[in-house]
Amino acid sequence: MKTAAELRQLVTRIDHRSYPAYKDTKGMYQFPGYLLSIDHVQGDPFASPSRVSIQVKGKIAGFPEQLYRTKWQKTALEDALIRQFGQCCEKFGFKAKGSGKSGMISISRCGQEVLERSAAQIDEKTGDIHIRLEVGFPANGRTINAREWIRIFFEFLPECVEKALYYKNCDAKRLQKISDLAEDQQALRDILPKLGLCAFVANGSILPRESGVSARPMKSAVCFQSPEEMEVEITLPHRGVIRGMGIRKGITLIVGGGYHGKSTLLKALELGVYNHIAGDGREYVITDSTAVKLRAEDGRSIKKTDISMFINDLPNGKDTTHFYTEDASGSTSQAANVVEAMEAKAGVMLIDEDTSATNFMIRDELMQRVIHRDMEPITPFIERIRELYEEEGISTVIVAGSSGAYFHIADCIVQMDRYVPKDITQTAKKEAEQFPQLSGPKEKAKKPDFARKPQQGREWKGNDRIKMKTLGKEAISINRETIDLRYVEQITDSEQVTALGYCVKYAQRHLLDGTRTLQEVVAMLEEKIEKESLAALCESTSSVANLARPRTQEIFACFDRYRGLKL
């Protein structure tokens, strides 16, 4: 390991040389108070910036163990450190001048959700801090600008480290509040099943967002207030007593007029699988962490999924126990999404009528009279929803605005009236008595077969040059094969998409051999991340990308939409 002085001498020596000479800086250097590692050097000032990491010993950083003693507190502290370091980066970004990306200093940008990220890691045993960032090495044209480079690494970064990564220079009260909030959120998440709840929305929560492109809370929004009949009281370790609407396990129907807040409530519930930062308005909107938002997804591929509990006796004689298509219809795609959510061990399904296939959700009486049941291959979701709960323990929350078909089978019916929820279960049930319930399915469905065993694709054998590109939150391209994730609506960050791409790459190289089921493959991926961190997916310290941890359910969703998956 070299010293900081040796690094300065090296950069001074290569000043004004051709840009590739920066490659000589790759390595580890001891700075006062921290270790600097230059992991990857860009080949050109206009290329993706260089990757740099900083390690601070726990004794020097000085963060109290009480701030990271549990997994969720550790993630919250890491998130806070990324935000603090990011603020410092913004202060110095592009202050060092030059061509292309010269002077760029950046770290992962965190949103409203608190996610585990590769950008910051704290060793729970030693308190050591590992920060990963990107730096644009300065150049004049395509020649090295050592003077500006030295400003970044000997002036700007040392100040960022001192201000953001040393506890003595941080706001101790703020960090304690962040830790306490994380502990309260986890306590609330843990207590839901004990109370027979699948979700909780605290009184005073702000559910609407600022705009379609901003996840910040709407300033003029109506604060959430639980109906008296659904209000529950919970005592948290730090916040104390908190009250709000408890959504019980079973079948919950959310109804109301257009623009009254139905979908806004459902959106808050679907993102309640994540913890949110203080001030977001949804800090205490907590949903079963395995909940999955489902919808129709015309055109998606389906790979040997057993959809026979919903679709049978197709006119073309196609086998629906191992259904395969490259262009699914709305109803078929939604049926596959339900079964795949079961495979991913979802405990709650969240469905909005607006984005569902009508013929998958219901069949009204007139249609059943005109088109006999024996002529219809689709068993609608309404005929399986009770079975899903009673046999599989899967609860469902449905938003409906045009059909009252689900009134008969719902356990709880909530009306959104000018953004205020009301429990109208008894009233709606009484009205529903005047409309006889349609007959249910003739027999219970056979439990889907989850024995799919993916194999390694031919293009992966002996090929170390597989290219991958993240396309925002919507898709990822692997070896020119695009995995469309537009309708996996609980992905909140493009870094989660990048992580999903690395999950696929790692699985293709190490796990897919035709002997393991997809469930076993995903379990092994989760185990690796849990034991070795997200960065372990990248397999090389020089190639660690900006990653955010996806849930198990999103890992399944990615494989399910991977057209190149060989089964």
PLM regions: where:
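N-terminal accessory targeting/assembly segments
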Residues: 1-196, 207, 567
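Flexible beta-alpha connector loops of hexameric P-loop NTPases
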Residues: 145, 300, 310-331, 363-378
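Carboxylate/His-rich catalytic cores and anion/metal-binding grooves
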Residues: 193-197, 203, 259, 266-297, ...
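N-terminal pre-Walker A segment at the start of P-loop NTPase domains
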Residues: 208-243, 278, 286-302, 307-318
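Glycine-rich phosphate-binding P-loop
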Residues: 242-274
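Conserved alpha-helical scaffold flanking the Walker A/P-loop in AAA+ ATPase domains
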Residues: 329-341
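Conserved P-loop NTPase nucleotide-binding/switch module
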Residues: 341-385, 389-390, 402-408, 412-429
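Conserved NTP phosphate-binding and transfer environment spanning the P-loop NTPase/kinase superfamily
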Residues: 390-393, 399-567
